[in-house]
C-alpha cells in the first residue's frame, strides 16, 4: 500500500482547509493510505495568539525523520514574500540527514499554497520545488487537469503548479468551492501517480 503524507503549515486555517481537501482527493484512490500532519510552530505562543493564529488545529505535529516513511508527500505552505513560510523552511532545513542518506530520493512530492492577495503563489510553489529537487523527489504538478483552472469568471487561486487559495489582505476570504475542487484534484492526481510508482 502506498503511503501519502499531507504535510502543511497553516497560521490562519486556509492551508489547513486545503490540506483536508487534498487528503480527501487522495483517499479516492484505492491502495493508498493518507495521513495529515503539520510542521511545528516556531513563533512564540504569545506572538502567535496576538497575531490571531489558529490554535485548535487537529493534525498531529510531524518530525523531519518520519518523512522517509512515506512514498509521497504533498507539502502545503502559506506564502511569505514569495517563498514558503519560515516554519516550513525551518522544518525542511532539518532534513539534511535524510538528504545525506538519500532517504527521500525517488519519492513523489507536490506543493500547494495560499497568499493574501495572490502575489507570489506560483513562485512559492516553484521555489519550494528547489528544496525538493535537492532531495531527488519526483515533483508532480497538476497541469490543467482540473477544469476549474479554466474558470476566469471569479477571483480564485489555483495554478498548473499546484492548488492555491487567495485569503485576502485581512485573511477573511476562505477557500472557495473551486479552490477546494482543485485541491481534491491535486490529492487524487498525486495519489494515483504514487500508487503506480509504488507498484
From Swiss-Prot:
Keywords: Flavoprotein, FMN, NAD, NADP, Nucleotide-binding, Oxidoreductase
GO molecular-function term, one example from the UniProt record: NAD binding
Protein name: NAD(P)H dehydrogenase (quinone)
EC supergroup of this enzyme: oxidoreductase
Signal peptide: none
PROSITE patterns (UniProt xref): FLAVODOXIN_LIKE
Species in which this protein is naturally found: Yersinia pseudotuberculosis serotype I (strain IP32953)
Family: Belongs to the WrbA family.
Record's cofactor remark: Binds 1 FMN per monomer.
Annotated residues for binding of FMN: 10-15, 79-81, 114-119, 134
Cofactor: FMN
GO CC term (a single one): membrane
Reactions catalysed, as given in the entry: a quinone + NADH + H(+) = a quinol + NAD(+); a quinone + NADPH + H(+) = a quinol + NADP(+)
Residues annotated to bind substrate: 99
Domain Flavodoxin-like, residue spans: 4-190
InterPro entries named in the record: Flavodoxin/NO_synth (IPR008254), Flavoprotein-like_sf (IPR029039), Flavoprotein_WrbA-like (IPR010089), FMN_Rdtase-like_dom (IPR005025), NQO (IPR037513)
SUPFAM superfamilies found in the cross-reference section: Flavoproteins
Amino acid at each position: 500500500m502506498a503511503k501519502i503524507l499531507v504535510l502543511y503549515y497553516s497560521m490562519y486555517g486556509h492551508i489547513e482547509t486545503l490540506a483536508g481537501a487534498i487528503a480527501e482527493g487522495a483517499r479516492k484512490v484505492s491502495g493508498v493510505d493518507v495521513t495529515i500532519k503539520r510542521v511545528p510552530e516556531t513563533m512564540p505562543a504569545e506572538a502567535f495568539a496576538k497575531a490571531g493564529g489558529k490554535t485548535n488545529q487537529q493534525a498531529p505535529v510531524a518530525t523531519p525523520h518520519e518523512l522517509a516513511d512515506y512514498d509521497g508527500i504533498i507539502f502545503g505552505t502559506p506564502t511569505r514574500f514569495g517563498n514558503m513560510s519560515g516554519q516550513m523552511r525551518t522544518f525542511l532545513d532539518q532534513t539534511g540527514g535524510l538528504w545525506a542518506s538519500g532517504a527521500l530520493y525517488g519519492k513523489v512530492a507536490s506543493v500547494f499554497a495560499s497568499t493574501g492577495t495572490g502575489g507570489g503563489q506560483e513562485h512559492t510553489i516553484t521555489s519550494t520545488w528547489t528544496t525538493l529537487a535537492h532531495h531527488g523527489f519526483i515533483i508532480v504538478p497538476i497541469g490543467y487537469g482540473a477544469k476549474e483552472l479554466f474558470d476566469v469568471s471569479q477571483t480564485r487561486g489555483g495554478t498548473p503548479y499546484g492548488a492555491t487559495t487567495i485569503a485576502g489582505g485581512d485573511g477573511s476570504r476562505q477557500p472557495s468551492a473551486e479552490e477546494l475542487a482543485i485541491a481534491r484534484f491535486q490529492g487524487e492526481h498525486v495519489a494515483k501517480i504514487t500508487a503506480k510508482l509504488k507498484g
